[in-house]
């Protein structure tokens, strides 16, 4: 004799002939109506959980946005470390703020919301005028991983050299191999003008991997999941690899683009420009009028140009700017060397004429502010050799004569007498 309870739904109690289907399991049965009801309950609870999660994300988003430095604050921070370049600092401040605002927004994006595109940056300007330093200073302020790569070291597949993914390896290393942190970092690719197509830029001698590298960089600039060889160099199946999503990595691409002024000048009808011309001293006026077609004529492919919607120029540093670079920033060279001497209990001072002489020597090297450290080092190195072993020296003053002699003519004042070190 059959027990009717074996044919009842364990949840609603309906018999099998009262429902469409009755699904049986070990010691339990459920009818089709209860299955539908259960699915509705699960869906309601899921939607409720998603709503709570969305509210939490939005609260967190507001909190992060409140903590994100505003463009004016970013500009003020850059102003403490970088002399001049007001327009570039303003452009970068806005671009970086919008980038990280977009990054926060992306975490709570739904299908119905407007998707914010990434805006990578192209910095154009002469060597040694602060392109890489600007990017580095931004990363330091935002406390995000930062990496610098030299475009000339990159090659396309099939050539000796580094794959483009190696720029991401440097970023991953700076993030202590924390992929999540690396995916919100900043990458600066310098010397990008050196991988221009030779056909459109006769002055560029290297073309073995020019257009090929540009093509290889397209995906990581736009946003892709890249396989990064943890051993560096070329990708190999035997090497361990990490997957990094570049969608939220900010790329700052920089180059001197020597000669592009002439391309711009020709297009807008100005006379030819040379390094000594008055017009070149106002190079930002020319660069402000740069168009994608100028970059294409220089040798960048259209697809590559399209991945760099923000273009800003770095201006030449004149003598007055260089003196300010020496003395005004928080980590100015003069301040650094004064600190080094103070650790030996000696005060260090510079005459204004000495600073002018140092700048004059640096300008002759034609490498911008980079030359300042090497000039300062050549002058101060002999002094720094002697000072630590002398306990009677209270202060050291660098004069124009000191600079002219490369360091041997130096007046040091102490409590008892003047000590002059000569050649």
Swiss-Prot record:
This is ATP-dependent Clp protease ATP-binding subunit ClpX. HAMAP family: ClpX (MF_00175). One of its GO terms (biological process) is cell division. The keyword RNA-binding does not apply. Signal peptide: none annotated. Keywords: ATP-binding, Chaperone, Metal-binding, Nucleotide-binding, Zinc. Component of the ClpX-ClpP complex. Forms a hexameric ring that, in the presence of ATP, binds to fourteen ClpP subunits assembled into a disk-like structure with a central cavity, resembling the structure of eukaryotic proteasomes. Zn(2+) binds at residues 9, 12, 31, 34. NCBIfam families: clpX, PRK05342.1. PANTHER family: ATP-DEPENDENT CLP PROTEASE ATP-BINDING SUBUNIT CLPX-LIKE, MITOCHONDRIAL, ATP-DEPENDENT CLP PROTEASE ATP-BINDING SUBUNIT CLPX-LIKE, MITOCHONDRIAL-RELATED. ATP-dependent specificity component of the Clp protease. It directs the protease to specific substrates. Can perform chaperone functions in the absence of ClpP. SMART domains: AAA (SM00382), ClpB_D2-small (SM01086), zf-C4_ClpX (SM00994). GO terms for molecular function: ATP binding; ATP hydrolysis activity; ATP-dependent protein folding chaperone; protein dimerization activity; unfolded protein binding; zinc ion binding. The lineage of its organism: Bacteria, Bacillati, Actinomycetota, Actinomycetes, Micrococcales. ATP binds at residues 126-133. Residues 1-50 form the ClpX-type ZB domain. It holds the Pfam family AAA_2. Belongs to the ClpX chaperone family. Coiled coil: none annotated. One of its GO terms (cellular component) is HslUV protease complex.
């Amino acid at each position: 004799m059959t027990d009717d309870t074996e044919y009842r739904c364990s949840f609603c109690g309906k018999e099998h002939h009262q429902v469409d289907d009755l699904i049986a399991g070990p010691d339990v049965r459920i009818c089709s109506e209860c299955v539908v009801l259960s699915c509705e309950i699960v869906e309601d609870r899921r939607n409720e959980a998603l709503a709570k999660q969305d509210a939490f994300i939005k609260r967190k988003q507001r909190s992060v946005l409140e903590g994100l430095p505003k463009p004016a604050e970013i500009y003020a921070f850059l102003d403490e470390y970088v002399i001049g370049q007001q327009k570039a600092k303003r452009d970068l401040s806005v671009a970086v703020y919008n980038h990280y605002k977009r990054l926060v927004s992306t975490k709570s994006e739904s299908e119905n919301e407007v998707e914010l595109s990434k805006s990578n940056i192209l910095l154009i300007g002469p060597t040694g005028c602060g392109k890489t330093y600007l990017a580095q200073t931004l990363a330091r302020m935002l406390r995000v991983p930062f990496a610098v790569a030299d475009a000339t070291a990159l090659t396309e597949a099939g050539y000796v050299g580094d794959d483009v993914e190696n720029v991401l390896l440097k970023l991953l290393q700076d993030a202590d191999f924390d992929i999540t942190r690396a995916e919100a970092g900043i990458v600066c690719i310098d010397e990008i003008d050196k991988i221009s197509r030779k056909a459109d830029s006769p002055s560029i001698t290297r073309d073995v991997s020019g257009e090929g590298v540009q093509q290889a960089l397209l995906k990581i600039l736009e946003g892709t999941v890249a396989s990064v060889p943890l051993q560096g160099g070329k990708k190999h199946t035997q090497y361990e690899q990490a997957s990094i999503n570049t969608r939220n990595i900010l790329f700052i691409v920089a180059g001197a683009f020597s000669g592009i002024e002439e391309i711009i000048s020709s297009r807008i009808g100005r006379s030819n420009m040379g390094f000594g011309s008055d017009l070149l001293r106002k190079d930002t006026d020319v660069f402000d009028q740069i168009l994608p077609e100028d970059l294409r004529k220089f040798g960048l492919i259209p697809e590559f140009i399209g991945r760099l919607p923000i273009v800003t120029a770095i201006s030449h540093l004149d003598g007055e700017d260089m003196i300010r670079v020496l003395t005004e920033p928080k980590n100015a060279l003069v301040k650094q060397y004064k600190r080094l001497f103070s650790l030996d209990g000696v005060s260090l001072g510079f005459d204004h004429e000495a600073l002018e002489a140092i700048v004059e020597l640096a300008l002759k090297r034609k490498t911008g502010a980079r030359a300042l450290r090497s000039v300062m080092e050549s002058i101060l190195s002999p002094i720094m050799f002697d000072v630590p072993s002398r306990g009677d020296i209270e202060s050291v003053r660098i004069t124009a004569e000191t600079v002219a002699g490369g360091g041997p003519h130096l007046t040091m004042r102490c409590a008892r007498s003047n000590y002059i070190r000569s050649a």
